[in-house]
Design a protein with these regions (language model features):
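Amphipathic alpha-helical segments used for helix-helix packing
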Residues: 95-117
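Amphipathic alpha-helical packing segments from all-alpha helical-bundle domains
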Residues: 65, 69-72, 115-150, 177
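Secondary-structure edge/capping motif, primarily at the C-terminal ends of alpha-helices
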Residues: 71-78, 105-112, 163-167
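Helix-turn-helix
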Residues: 12, 20-54, 58
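Hydrophobic alpha-helical connector segments
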Residues: 58, 72-99, 152
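N-terminal intrinsically disordered/low-complexity leader segments
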Residues: 1-8
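Hydrophobic/aromatic-rich alpha-helical bundle segments in the mid-to-C-terminal region
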Residues: 106, 138-181
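Alpha-helical DNA-contacting segments of helix-turn-helix folds
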Residues: 56-63, 70
Length: 184
């Protein structure tokens, strides 16, 4: 869906949909709930989005673009920050359960069979993020391997799973420091 342009009202529905899917999941939130929460009628919803599947696709594309903007701001425009601190900011941004990556992470598990386009959006973001992490690792260590970037991505996702199962926030920090020590 290149050049996604939405009317203001439709964009408000997308923002609310992102919030609903973030907390309720893709299968538990139906069109009726979206319509009720956003106070648009079903006809308007289907006029804007045509189906729940397309609505989910649009929500994930919007979320992916927002997150990519945040990542680019960290790695490209923050010139006063060291590479290690940039990697740490990326790690913290992506392991925040209230943050934008959580929805894309959730989509990997919940959309593969039912919403394949949405699943592909989440997978494409993971690939893009791996490349961004790799470019930062190369600045840190010339002989860094692409697998190092994948390991950090797996650590991000492992930290999310750990946070979902417990309240050990300090473990997240310790895990990142372990990665840096192993890289050195």
């Amino acid at each position: 869906m290149p050049n996604l342009i939405l009317p203001t009202r439709a964009f408000e529905v997308v923002k609310k949909g992102i919030d609903l899917f973030h907390y309720g999941g893709f299968h538990m939130v139906g069109v009726d709930k979206i319509v009720r929460e956003t106070e648009v009628n079903k006809m308007t919803f289907y006029n804007y989005f045509h189906s729940k599947e397309r609505f989910i696709d649009i929500c994930l594309i919007v979320q992916k673009e927002r997150l990519q903007d945040q990542v680019v701001a960290i790695v490209e425009y923050d010139h006063d920050t060291s590479t290690i601190d940039k990697l740490k900011k990326l790690y913290i941004l992506h392991t925040d359960l209230e943050g934008p990556y959580y929805l894309l992470f959730k989509a990997i598990f919940e959309t593969k069979n039912s919403y394949p386009n949405a699943y592909q959006t989440a997978v494409r973001y993971r690939t893009w993020l791996s490349n961004e992490i790799y470019s930062q690792l190369r600045l840190l260590k010339n002989d860094a391997a692409f697998n190092d970037a994948k390991i950090l991505l797996y650590m991000i996702e492992g930290a999310i799973i750990q946070l979902l199962s417990s309240e050990q926030v300090d473990q997240k920090e310790r895990l990142f420091n372990y990665f840096l020590n192993a890289l050195a």
